[in-house]
Amino acid sequence: MQASQFSAQVLDWYDKYGRKTLPWQIDKTPYKVWLSEVMLQQTQVATVIPYFERFMARFPTVTDLANAPLDEVLHLWTGLGYYARARNLHKAAQQVATLHGGKFPETFEEVAALPGVGRSTAGAILSLSLGKHFPILDGNVKRVLARCYAVSGWPGKKEEIGRAHV
């Protein structure tokens, strides 16, 4: 299957069945997309929505998150699990505040350098909020690609991921 055919089929599917009204999809900003992407790691959408809404109500900007005590961030995160994500969010927000003047970085290298942000998350932030063209290789994307292109082995293996990022 040609890449153009594949992308057309995926976009058609998204037009018919995709979610388009999630809280982080409305008025997309790098901060909102980043927050949602981190919360969605290993966590279902339905679980994330109320946490995302609470975080946005309490920390409407990355600077607000950076200036909050870590204990408050962890308290709002309670129940979401994988607390390293919350600690990394806080550290990354502090870096954005100090190194970038509170403006979320807009280059792949700068975003990927933030604590807790890997290549896929950096790609998602820049693609979904700014329309830049970077791959997003989360578990769902890897499964779809593996099925469509008959990838042998688990698509989460490092060598498969490396090929996909080429």
Positions of predicted regions on the chain:
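Catalytic cores of DNA base-excision repair glycosylases
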Residues: 2-4, 9-165
